From Swiss-Prot:
Organism annotation: Streptococcus pyogenes serotype M4 (strain MGAS10750)
GO BP terms in the entry: mismatch repair
Name used for this protein in its record: DNA mismatch repair protein MutS
Binding site for ATP: G602, P603, N604, M605, S606, G607, K608, S609
Family, per entry: Belongs to the DNA mismatch repair MutS family.
SMART domains xref list: MUTSac (SM00534), MUTSd (SM00533)
Statement: the UniProt record of this protein carries the keyword DNA repair: yes
Gene Ontology cellular-component annotations: cytosol
Gene3D superfamilies listed in its UniProt record: 1.10.1420.10, DNA repair protein MutS, domain I, MutS, connector domain, P-loop containing nucleotide triphosphate hydrolases
NCBIfam families listed in its UniProt record: mutS1, PRK05399.1
Record key words, sorted: ATP-binding, DNA damage, DNA repair, DNA-binding, Nucleotide-binding
Length: 851
């Protein structure tokens, strides 16, 4: 930036900008926020606004761009959404009264993790995450500045940190230490996060008291310091710091949650088609956020789960009362975010009216809850604080038709303040007084067309035409002379005018002061409001789960301590909702104490993945306290779910399907316990056939012998079904098919035993591949099945680590050993599971040329 001949105003800009080099500086100048230099050039491009210059005729004009102050929020939202920070510098004094340059200061730094106001408000949480490291463990704290939620935990490794950040869907991460290059690449390049830095711990320990580890304290303290530094105000709405342990909830990685479509559909990235979409019959924004949290973090405490179940059952048994409850909750606004707006000094009259309307609903909600006559519901009722004094204050103070801004007046109700009522009376009756004076002077003077007018320069005046100047009374004094008339005033008129102007000015100022006082009073209730918000959110989620259970005919699951899984006629809740009850085919799932692994075989499109996801969703719904989609369910309590369902490359990090498979398998076998659930779908398909088969077998044996977790392993390797003769806790199941007159029908029903065929060519037929290609594939299949012998893969002793023995078991399919070797290499290189129909056809053509 060239600083030659810089004006005082621009010098002020540069002085402020140097303190915020990583943020766009919005510099208030009159009715606009201006940006200069590089900020202006970049903002003009990002916001699609005009780029001009200051001092256009100068040798080096300063680039400039601006946005109107009244619509600035929508432009700020765009910059924040793109991952930038915005510093807002306001005028701190009236420009008309300023001596020299108007005083300006940054009043707030808005970052992706600290958004409070938005032109497009979202009911979802917006978490800012802070992480610290003590050389052994990681401290992770997170906060939603818009709701005041504040939590902290400690984690063993960076993989856990990454997963927790992903689960929180954070956009900004605050660091208190130096990351390794690999870790920084993961957060910035792969996860697209904004990294910020803070080395100072917030001094006020009262906000982070409790039994915390040192690394938890530093993470929480640095997070608080950063938030106070960027928001530049006291944050009275911050809730008490909550310490949590990952082990207190059903553990699932972000990849697991994505593959199960828990909070959004993995294919569309939309809520529709997810478990969250299915279960959401909430009526409040607070309830929506809490429901998502329950889905993200199912419980592992049987007592807590049963308590939720009891309340849902009570709600189910009382349709009329539950309907009344749902209708009453519709009148509840977002108390958490309204409280934060009060704390930030941004609450307007409409916000207070929404708060008052909500509080007016609370007694009705409380009465409905009491009518259920349930000890479990009463525990919620007893904690409900209706805040009647606050509701009364808002109801009697704020005009129900008050505008959204505090500068337009008409905010305070008549009768709330005597002085304000007096000023309003003066303004209201002043017009009548003016009319009375006009009539009196017209009659006394004999000037028939005498009238009183008003303008800003002369105020109120008598308008007298030149033809009537001789009739002007002596007590009139001249205020202005025009070509064809004169303007006069009187002492009486001046007195009335003074009273009216004083009333207008005093009324506006007094009304503003009264509103500020009321808002300050509301702020003293924030802690009580937040407690009320939590209870109402809990009630909302529980009634939502009751509505969903009744609508979809869900049942109450049971839990056992025997490691037994019994699901009778279970359904994939989301698929059933999308397809319709009549079309969905239910499946029972059974694991006795002896069984730890189900090996499931069957063709693609037959329902293996749905069967696996059905079990996972049933477990998640059950452990979050929900009723489930089945005729009967009895489950053990799981501590974690690990999945590998669906093939996908991680293109951003450059990892292949097979690498992703192996990494997820590694996480499962390292972290799973005998209380975990593992779901592996076609593990090993990302590499050559025998490599994949060998790894699949080794993983199954490892889980069987060392982990003991309940596992469903879906595979196309039919040779693996022989493992049931060796592994006592493994059973075979398959997807049943009906074969008639050459046509195959997938029944989508799970049956005992292994599948006898793969029906891969039939699936290719359904996909519409050319008949000639299908015919050739059938010929090749027949030849392979005729000429090949058993691979003997199951006979490999467990101690053999190399796959060479497997390869040595392969026979030549052709007499010419050299050609056979060439063809064998070509076959091993084929990644069947990830080929498109066109690639399959091309590959078959190339293989044919080798014969």
């Amino acid at each position: 930036m060239a600083k030659t001949n810089i004006s005082p105003g621009m010098q002020q800009y540069l002085d402020i900008k140097k303190d915020y080099p990583d943020a766009f500086l919005l510099f208030r100048m009159g009715d606009f926020y201006e940006l200069f230099y590089e900020d202006a050039v970049k903002a003009a491009q990002l916001l699609e606004i005009g780029l001009t210059s200051r001092n256009k005729n100068a040798e080096n004009p300063i680039p400039m761009a601006g946005v109107p102050h009244h619509s600035a929020q929508q432009y700020i939202d765009v910059l924040i959404e793109l991952g930038y920070k915005v510093a807002v510098a306001e005028q701190m004094e009236d420009p008309k009264q300023a001596v020299g340059v108007v005083k300006r200061e940054v009043v707030q730094v808005i970052t992706p993790g600290t958004v409070v106001d938005s032109a497009k408000p979202d009911s979802a949480n917006n978490f800012l995450v802070a992480i610290d490291f003590d050389g052994c463990r990681y401290g992770l704290a997170y906060m939603d500045v818009s709701t005041g939620e504040f939590c902290v935990t400690d984690l063993a490794d960076f993989t856990s940190v990454r997963s927790e950040i992903q689960n929180l869907k954070a956009k900004e991460v605050l660091l208190g230490f130096d990351l390794s290059e690999e870790e920084q690449t993961i957060l910035v390049k792969q996860m697209n996060l904004l990294l910020s830095y803070e080395e100072t711990v917030y001094e006020d320990k009262s906000l982070i008291d409790g039994q915390l580890t040192t690394v938890e304290l530093t993470a929480a303290g640095k997070l608080l310091q950063y938030v106070h530094k960027t928001q530049m105000r006291e944050l009275s709405h911050l809730q008490a710091l909550v310490h949590y342990e990952i082990k207190d909830y059903l553990q699932m990685s972000y990849a697991t949650k994505s593959s199960l479509d828990l909070v959004e559909n993995a294919r569309t990235n939309k809520k529709h088609g997810s478990l969250y979409w299915l279960l959401d019959e909430t009526k409040t924004a607070m309830g929506m956020r809490l429901l998502r949290s329950w889905i993200d973090r199912p419980l592992v405490s049987k007592e807590a789960i049963l308590e939720r179940q009891e309340i849902i059952q009570v709600f189910l048994n009382a349709f009329i009362e539950r309907t009344d409850l749902s209708n009453s909750l519709k009148g509840v606004y977002d108390i958490e975010r309204l409280s934060s707006r009060v704390s930030f000094g941004k609450a307007n009259p409409k916000d207070l009216l929404q708060l008052g309307h909500t509080l007016a609903q609370v007694p009705y909600i409380k009465a409905i809850l009491e009518s259920f006559n349930s000890a479990y519901v009463d525990k919620l009722v007893n904690d409900i604080d209706s805040l009647p004094e606050l509701e009364y204050l808002i109801r009697t103070a704020i005009d129900p038709d008050a505008p959204a801004t505090i500068s337009e007046g008409s905010i305070i109700r008549n009768g709330f303040d005597e002085r304000l009522d007096h000023y309003r009376k003066v303004m209201r009756e002043g017009t009548g007084w003016i009319a009375d004076i006009e009539a009196k002077e017209r009659q006394a003077s004999g000037i028939n067309n005498l009238k009183i007018d008003y303008n800003k320069k002369d105020g109120y005046y008598f308008h007298v035409t030149n033809s009537n100047l001789s009739l002007v009374p002596d007590h009139f004094f001249r205020k202005a002379t025009l070509k064809n008339s004169e303007r006069y005033g009187t002492a009486e008129l001046a007195k009335i005018e003074g009273q009216m102007l004083e009333a207008r000015e005093e009324s506006s100022s007094l009304e503003y002061d009264i509103f500020m006082c009321i808002r300050a009073q509301v702020e003293t209730y924030i802690n009580r409001l937040q407690k009320l918000a939590k209870i109402l959110a809990t009630v909302d989620v529980l009634q939502s789960l009751a509505v969903v259970a009744e609508t979809n005919h869900y049942i109450r699951p049971q839990f056992n301590d025997n490691h037994v899984i019994t699901i009778q006629e279970g359904r994939h809740a989301v698929v059933e909702k999308v397809m319709g009850v009549q079309e969905y085919i239910p499946n029972s799932i059974s694991f006795d104490q002896q069984t730890s692994i189900q090996l499931i075989t069957g063709p693609n499109m037959s329902g293996k993945s749905t069967y696996m996801r059905q079990l996972a969703l049933t477990v998640i719904m059950a452990q979050m306290g929900s009723f489930v989609a089945a005729d009967h369910v009895d489950l053990p309590l799981f501590d974690a779910i690990f999945t590998r369902i669906g093939a996908a490359d991680d293109l951003i990090s450059g990892q292949s399907t097979f690498m992703v498979e192996m990494m997820e398998a590694n996480q499962a076998i390292k972290r799973a316990s005998d209380n975990s659930l593992i779901l592996f779908d076609e593990l090993g398909r990302g590499t050559a056939t025998y490599d994949g088969m060998a790894l699949a077998q080794a993983i199954i044996e490892y889980i069987h012998d060392r982990v003991g977790a309940k596992t469903i392993f879906a595979t196309h390797y039919h040779e693996l079904t022989d493992l049931s003769t060796k592994l006592t806790s493994l059973v075979n199941v398959h997807v049943a098919t009906l074969e008639k007159d050459g046509d195959v029908t997938f029944l989508h029903k799970i049956a005992e035993g292994p599948a006898d065929k793969s029906y891969g060519i039939h699936v290719a037929k359904i996909a519409g591949l050319p008949k000639s290609l299908l015919k050739r594939a059938d010929e090749v299949l027949t030849r392979l099945e005729t000429q090949s012998r058993s691979t003997e893969i199951m006979s490999v002793p467990p101690q053999v680590e190399s796959s060479s023995a497997v390869r040595q078991g392969q026979l030549s399919l052709f007499g010419d050993e050299e050609k056979a070797h060439e063809i064998r290499q070509a076959l091993e290189a084929i990644d069947v599971m990830n080929m498109t129909p066109l690639q399959a056809m091309t590959t078959l053509y190339e293989l044919k040329k080798l014969l």
